[in-house]
Curated annotation (Swiss-Prot):
It catalyses: adenosine(2503) in 23S rRNA + 2 reduced [2Fe-2S]-[ferredoxin] + 2 S-adenosyl-L-methionine = 2-methyladenosine(2503) in 23S rRNA + 5'-deoxyadenosine + L-methionine + 2 oxidized [2Fe-2S]-[ferredoxin] + S-adenosyl-L-homocysteine; adenosine(37) in tRNA + 2 reduced [2Fe-2S]-[ferredoxin] + 2 S-adenosyl-L-methionine = 2-methyladenosine(37) in tRNA + 5'-deoxyadenosine + L-methionine + 2 oxidized [2Fe-2S]-[ferredoxin] + S-adenosyl-L-homocysteine. GO terms for biological process: rRNA base methylation; tRNA methylation. Residues 125-364 form the Radical SAM core domain. This is Dual-specificity RNA methyltransferase RlmN. [4Fe-4S] cluster binds at residues 139, 143, 146. The active site is at residues 119, 369.
């Protein structure tokens, strides 16, 4: 597959795996939003109109290679087909409600999805530019150190609302090309929500990201991050091949049960076994998974816990990202000191693990890892205010 740069030239039970039901809002119009369709679906739609498959490919190229949303601008499409498309279809990406820019070049967009908002973050670096994309409005998993989790869960995003974040960002970044802004080269499903609880929408969206007539990204440049929804992870391996990152954050079940509550349903051993099964099928990961580990002061950052983590991961090929915790209002944690992070990292490297301390980006605009919140109407009725008033959070110190 050729790789094109992106430019404009609840509890777990509250958010099911979406095997049979996709939680969405109703479309704003009766027209088909072509951003909801991957290439196979697009060709089927065009066939229903009596058109040949290559016409669908042509339209996709205009949509994703050039970020056009007006059929009249698609000059190699005949006028009759353009008129037909105007009657029955549209290209409607979610709009930007607010944009914030960090001193380090990071850009955060609040994206309107119905009457709510999710957040999308553009992170430029010397050799790449990564877009962090949301998959749900809120999140049901209640990870205690994450701002999104404190908003509760409302619904899954549609395909058009997921790929639409990439489309909108690519269009904006393309317009900034003259300023030297780096085109998007990587997409990570690490924004608001648990992607594996929205497989029916996340998988087609990632398919479009990697399609030659879509955004044309390599499978190694599209990453899905999960906290450990094991049945859905097994299903993912049969549906698509992308890079995998896992939100581990603790070396033992007693700590992970507290800070990542889904661990009470799928413990570390069960989770890592599923990860190894995925790696056995995947070519996108180069044989190893990325382990994400947020550093919480005196919670999970002792040298003893570093040894425990090394033991925990000894049978799982991986590289480890140590993430400085990013604070949000009302959170009961502190960021690990540089000295504790350094000691933790050195222990892991002594065991032979590739270990990276992630540089915090966009924290001045609350765009850093764990800080995304958006605007969520909480269908699970779990808000930070209620938690702090009626459900004290148990914390172990080490």
């Amino acid at each position: 597959m050729s790789e094109q740069l992106l430019t404009a030239s609840t509890s777990i039970d509250a958010a099911p795996l979406s095997d049979n039901t996709v939680q969405t809002t109703a479309p704003a119009t009766s027209k088909i939003n072509l951003l909801d369709l991957n290439r196979q679906q697009m060709r089927e739609f065009f066939a229903e109109m009596g058109e040949k498959p290559f016409r669908a490919d042509q339209v996709m190229k205009w949509m994703y290679h050039y970020c056009y949303d007006d059929f009249e601008q698609m000059t190699d499409i005949n006028k009759g087909l353009r008129a037909k498309l105007q009657r029955v279809a549209e290209i409607r990406a979610p709009e930007v409600a607010e944009e914030q820019r960090s001193v380090d070049g990071t850009i955060k967009w609040a994206i309107k999805v119905g009457d709510q908002q999710v957040e999308t973050v553009y992170i430029p670096e010397a050799d790449r530019a990564t877009l962090c994309v949301s998959s749900q409005v809120g999140c049901a998993l209640e990870c205690k150190f994450c701002s999104t989790a404190q908003q509760g869960f409302n619904r899954n995003l549609r395909v058009s609302e997921i790929i639409g974040q990439v489309w909108r960002a690519a269009k904006i970044i393309g317009s900034l090309k003259s300023t030297g802004t780096r085109p998007i080269t990587n997409v990570v499903m690490m924004g608001m929500g648990e992607p594996l609880l929205n497989l029916n929408n996340v998988v087609p969206a990632m398919d479009i990201m990697m399609d030659d007539f879509g955004f044309g990204l390599s499978k190694r440049r599209v990453t899905l991050s999960t906290s450990g929804v094991v049945p859905a992870l097994d299903k993912l391996g049969d549906m698509i091949d992308v890079a995998l990152a896992i939100s581990l954050h603790a070396p033992t079940d007693d700590i992970r049960d507290e800070i990542v509550p889904i661990n009470r349903k799928y413990n570390i051993e069960t989770f890592l076994a599923a990860v190894r099964r995925y790696l056995d099928k995947s070519k996108a990961n180069g044989g190893r998974v990325t382990v994400e580990y947020v550093m919480l002061d005196h919670i999970n950052d002792s040298t003893e816990q570093a040894h425990q983590l090394a033991e925990c991961l000894k049978d799982t090929p991986c590289k480890i990202n140590l993430i400085p915790w990013n604070p949000f209002p009302g959170a009961p944690y502190g960021r690990s000191s540089n000295s504790r992070v350094d000691r933790f990292s050195k222990v892991l490297m002594e065991y032979g693990f590739t270990t990276i301390v992630r540089k915090t980006r966009g924290d001045d605009i609350d765009a850093a890892c764990g800080q995304l919140a958006g605007e969520v109407i909480d269908r699970t009725k779990r808000t930070l205010k209620k938690k702090m008033a009626g459900e004290p959070i148990a914390i172990k110190t080490v």
